[in-house]
A protein has these predicted regions:
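Formylglycine-dependent sulfatase
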Residues: 1-174
Length: 174
C-alpha cells in the first residue's frame, strides 16, 4: 500500500482494506479515515502523551472532522492533501501548508521544513510528559524535485527523473 492506505494502517493498527482506505484519497473525494476509527494519537493523548504530526496527513480534508487536530494530534504542521510541490507547497492549484488548520506562507523545501519542525517539537515539548511524534514525509513522492546540492550529488545518474528521485532520497536521508 501507498499514501493514504499506509497512513491509515499506521495510525489505527488495522488493515487498510478493513478500513476501506484502499487507494490515495483524492482532494475531490468527500471521504477520509472513518471518524469512528480511533487513531494511536487519540489513544496516547488520552494516556497523557503530547501528540504531534509534522508532515503529510492525506487522510481526508473534505470535512473538519478529518483534520489531524480532530484526530488526536495536539499540534499539526504540514499539509493535508497528497503530493504537494516541494518548494511552492501547492496541490491541485491550491496552497496547502498549515499549522493547526491555519494557512502558513513559508518558503523552503518541504522535506527540510518537516524535519526542522519535528526537531523543534522534540526540543520544545513538555519534558515532564511523554511524547508521540508522527513525522510523515512526502519524499520521495511525485513531483520529482530536489535542491540543487542534492541533484549535484546524484549527477552520476544520466536519466533526469531517476537523478531527481535519487536526490530526493538522499535529501530525505540527510
Amino acid at each position: 500500500p501507498t499514501c493514504s492506505p499506509t497512513r491509515a494502517s499506521l495510525l489505527t493498527g488495522k488493515s487498510s482494506l478493513r478500513l476501506g482506505v484502499i487507494r490515495p484519497i483524492a482532494k475531490i473525494q468527500p471521504k477520509g479515515l472513518g471518524i469512528d476509527e480511533t487513531t494511536v494519537a487519540e489513544h496516547l493523548k488520552e494516556a497523557g502523551y503530547q501528540t504531534f504530526l509534522s508532515g503529510k496527513w492525506h487522510l481526508g480534508f473534505a470535512r473538519s472532522e478529518y483534520h489531524p487536530n480532530r484526530r488526536g494530534f495536539d499540534e499539526f504542521y504540514g499539509f493535508v492533501s497528497g503530493g504537494i510541490g516541494y518548494w511552492d507547497h501547492v496541490h491541485g492549484g491550491g496552497y496547502d501548508w498549515q499549522r493547526d488548520g491555519v494557512t502558513l506562507r513559508e518558503s523552503g523545501y518541504s522535506t527540510e521544513l518537516i524535519a526542522k519542525e519535528a526537531v523543534r517539537l522534540i526540543k520544545d515539548r513538555d519534558k515532564k510528559r511523554p511524547l508521540f511524534l508522527f513525522a510523515s514525509f512526502n519524499a520521495p513522492h511525485l513531483p520529482n524535485d530536489a535542491p540543487q546540492k542534492a541533484l549535484a550529488a546524484a549527477s552520476y545518474i544520466e536519466d533526469p527523473l531517476r537523478q531527481a528521485h535519487a536526490a530526493m532520497i538522499g535529501e530525505f536521508d540527510r
